[in-house]
Design a protein with these regions (language model features):
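Residue-level "contact hotspot" at macromolecular interaction interfaces
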Residues: 97, 103-104, 149
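Sliding clamp-binding short linear motifs
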Residues: 1-97, 161-163, 169-216
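Short nucleic-acid-contacting surface segments enriched for D/E, G, S/T with interspersed K/R
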Residues: 142-157
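OB-fold (S1/OB) nucleic-acid-binding surfaces
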Residues: 116-141
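Flexible glycine-rich surface loops and low-complexity tracts that mediate binding to linear polymers
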Residues: 110, 154-167
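Structural detector for short beta-strands of small beta-barrel domains
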Residues: 103-117
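Hydrophobic, well-ordered secondary-structure elements that form the walls
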Residues: 68, 108, 127, 153, ...
């Protein structure tokens, strides 16, 4: 019902109930209509107080994306930054500090893929991380070489050269890699089988399936 959807969207945090606690409380509510003077608390009823496992910050972001398509808590890529740093991937905020022709590696969630018919096979991709956006240019030969990674990725890593024209910065892709598997590390239970056997965590979703696919335009 409506209350359950609000709980799943983490709408009760302002009254001290996080998503998991709110869903637990909502599950105890009756679906039957209650009269005006009925359903009052009874001193004779002792509810069992359970300590539910806390959802991690990353887990909350996953759930936010699953229910509302975005999160105001944090950007998903921020939880992967240490892993990306080990791959020498820099935040998009560093792009303006580079010089034309510098080699760079960036990664982010794909928001747009665009392959205009007038562009002679060139693919334009926009990715976003916790710092901002990066505009990528993928030439036809590179696209054919990395087609599967580009088409299937939610989280894409690109290595290439910086191209600066006035205030506009592009990354000309040399190679593209699908890093969507890293999104799974954001789950509270990395092993999906554990979630099936743990009732208190049955609300968890697969992060790799939650984050939006890029929009495709021609």
């Amino acid at each position: 019902g409506t209350i359950e959807k609000l709980a799943d969207a983490d709408a009760f945090r302002s009254i001290g109930l996080d998503r998991r606690k709110a869903l637990w409380e909502v599950s105890a509510l009756s679906d039957k209509p209650v009269g005006m003077f009925e359903g009052q608390p009874s001193a004779s009823v002792n509810e069992v107080q359970l300590e539910l496992p806390l959802i991690t910050d990353a887990g909350h972001v996953v759930e936010d994306y699953a229910t509302t398509g975005l999160s105001l808590k944090a950007h998903p890529v921020s939880f992967l930054r240490s892993q990306l740093h080990s791959m020498r991937v820099m935040p998009t905020s560093q792009l303006p500090k580079l010089k034309n022709g510098d080699f760079v590696a960036v990664a982010g969630l794909i928001t747009v893929r665009q392959r205009p018919g007038t562009a002679k096979g060139v693919l334009f991709i926009t990715i976003e991380d916790e710092a901002g956006f990066a505009n990528l240019v993928v030439w036809g030969k590179v696209f054919e070489q990395y087609r599967r990674d580009i088409v299937q990725a939610r989280l894409l890593m690109v290595e290439g050269r910086v191209q600066i024209e006035g205030q506009v910065i592009h990354v000309i892709a040399n190679s593209c890699y699908n890093l969507s598997y890293l999104l799974k590390t954001m789950a509270d239970v990395p092993n999906p089988d554990m979630a099936l056997s743990t009732l208190s965590r049955s609300d968890e979703k697969d992060p790799e399936e939650v984050f939006h696919k890029g929009r495709n335009f021609r």
